[in-house]
Every structure is written in structure tokens, then in C-alpha cells.
């Protein structure tokens, strides 16, 4: 919406004048009949969800979010979502059991787990024995059948059922309240009370319990994620649960592990909390060959069985002997490269020697042009006698060809002076000429030797030969 323009222009002439007072308007309320016909829009949030979905890396994952229906998990169960999680909820939120970590539970264990008397809590036993209280009257779950059979028995079964029901109700209550709670104290207390029950009733209760567990496992309905065989192999064993399987059951489990490997190429092992793992399980795990970043080569689906699994699969990476061999080959290649990449041979300069020279010295020759000295080249200075008893000054370049940089006769009137630290200055007509246009013009030449002693010696010889 555009701003309102100024009604009065402010200038240097009217800046001290007071503005006219404006009348303040009032709002008038519409009648109810008019308001009924109006469409009143209210602000609403576009994405209405749980508070846990507002942020975080796992905000899209809703498998552990507890809906307001009470005790039902949307991530498990049938597709309709009407069946509760088996073994964790009985359809009723029981709030009679206080938390394990409370001081009252530590002082009086009977309050947390119910009465530990021989008869047990009748309310919990009735709820467990009745399959209709498990949340689904038409399809009772296998855990309900197992608990009902466990409850119908001697006093050991009743106390064990009461203990399990109390643990289940406590877990369901507190997990629904806070899914991030720590359940470690539960199993420690469960271990303690289970040991007390077993001390009271001895081995008779354990033997009957193992038989009832076996019957319950046989009558268990198929699960949504796999067969009953996989569930039987991946059962949870808590620390302190001293149930002993019969030899026949051990033989059945061993034969199943040998003949029916897991669909993903590894032997399935049971989850053990605080209990020693059977050596047969470790042996079966160690017998599986390590494939190392490579999948099974058999033509099998994701959840199917692989017929070629027993064959060892070769790793895509080389082993240690191959690595050693590769290192040897690379060493040989490196040696060949080093031989090929040697430094290029240095150019050997064969100096052209003047046999009849009585004086030879390495020097650098300069010539003067435009009031500055320019380098002519590096070579060897030779002083040679001639037939007419004169001295020839010859400077050859240090190359294989031995190009002549300067070749003149020392005349008697040639200027020769000592300059600088190791320089000798002469004036002559250069041959070969420096400037072809002015070939007969004298040019100042500068001869630089290595040391000052060499310069003094050369200057002395030149003066002697010039005078001669």
C-alpha cells in the first residue's frame, strides 16, 4: 500500500506555523446480521504435525511416533494400522505399576511387580489369559496364546506371568510417555526378581517353562517381516534367563543353521544381553567367507536364497603377494624410467690450441659502443710472435669451432691502460670488424681476466711487446 502524500508543503516561510488539528475518526461495529453474511478467514498453519516433526535430520521418519490413539504404533502391524504391537500393549493403559527407578519400588518390590505370593495378582492373570484384552478379539496374537498357556499352570507359571505382565505394562506406559527413556534398570530388576522366583520353585518350573515356550513357538502365526523360522532364530535372551533348551531343540537349530543360511549371505545369530554366546554360533559366523566390498555372485533376489553362496568369492582387491609383485614391477619400471631420464650428456668443448703462442689466458672481451661496454664473447687470449717480429693478439671463442673474436697486431702506438680490478683497456681497429659500415674506425676494447694478478701480468706483457 502506497504512503499518503503530504497535504501541506513545508517551506522556509511556513515552517513556524502550526498545523491544523485533524479530526480523529472512530470505528463503527457492524451488526450481527451483517457479520453472519461475511466470510471471516482465520490464520492456520499449513503443516500441522507433531512437535517432534518440527526439526532434526530424522523429521521425516514417523516409525517411532506414538499417535494419540493410545498404545498403537504406526510403524508396525498390518497395513490398516488397527492391530497393536504384539507383546507390548494389551489395549488398556494400566497406570497401577509405578516406575522401577522410584524409591518406593526399590524399598518394596511387590508394588512394582505385583504380589509375589503363590496365587499372584488375579487381575493381571485374567487379562493375560483372556485373548480379547489384547486389542483384537477376532485375531488373537501368538503372544497372547503363549501367555495364557503360561498362566494356566502351577504357582511358578503364575508368578512368572505376573512378573512379565508388570514389565510389559511398565514399558508400554513409559515408552508411550517418553520414547527416549532408558530401559536399562528394568532388565536389572527383572533379573533379580526372576532369580528369586527360580530359587523358590527350583528346576521344575524351568523345565515346564521351556516346554511351554517350545509349544508357543510352534503355534506362532507368521510375522509381517519374515517366517517363524527367522523369528525363532533371532529371539531375545535377557541376562539371567536360565532357561535350558532340550538337546532335540539344539539339534534342530543347528541343522537349520547349516541347511538354511540367511538371505543376505550371513548366518543369523540370536541377540544375547549379558550372556555367553554359544560356540557353535561363533563357529558358524567365522566359517562364512569374507567377500570384502563385493556382493554374492549368485543370481538371487534381495530376500531369496543363494545357491552358490558356499563357494568362496574372490575379493576385488589384490592380496599381499600380488601387491608385492606389483611393487616389484613398479620398481623395475621406475628403474627403467630413471635410466631413461638421466641428465643429457654435457657438451664437451674441445678448445682450439695455439701451439706457437707464448702466452694464453681465459678472458671475456667487451667493446665500447654508445658510451657503454657491450659483451663480445668469452674465449682464450693468445699472444703469438709473427715473422716480422711483431706480436699478434688473438682471442678465440670457447667453442668447438673456435670462432675468432679479435685478431690484431700490437702496434707501437696502441693505447694500453690498466683499469678497474681485473681489466685491461686497449684501443685498436677490430678484426673482424664490429660495424661493417665503419670498419676502419678504432674501437675501445676491454679485456677482463679472472684475477688482478692476471690483469697486471697481461698489461705488463702488452707494454713490453708494444715497445719492442
Curated annotation (Swiss-Prot):
Single biological process term from Gene Ontology: mRNA transport
Compositionally biased region (Polar residues): 304-317
Compositionally biased residues, Low complexity: 137-148
Stretches the record annotates as Disordered: 1-26, 122-148, 201-224, 238-269, 304-345
Sequence repeats: 76-77, 113-114, 225-226, 273-274, 303-304
Disulfide bridge partners, by residue number: none
Region (5 X 2 AA repeats of F-G): 76-304
Phosphothreonine found at: 246, 259
Coiled coil: none
Record-linked PROSITE patterns: RANBD1 (PS50196)
Regions crossing the membrane: none
Sequence positions bearing Phosphoserine: 52, 208, 221, 234, 270, 296
Modified sites of kind N6-acetyllysine: 8, 83, 127, 450
GO cellular component: nuclear envelope; nuclear membrane; nuclear pore; nucleoplasm
Tissue-level expression: Ubiquitous. Highest levels in testis, peripheral blood leukocytes and fetal liver.
UniProt entry keywords in alphabetical sequence: Acetylation, Isopeptide bond, Membrane, mRNA transport, Nuclear pore complex, Nucleus, Phosphoprotein, Protein transport, Repeat, Translocation, Transport, Ubl conjugation
Domain RanBD1: 335-468
Official protein name in the record: Nuclear pore complex protein Nup50
Organism in which the protein naturally occurs: Homo sapiens (Human)
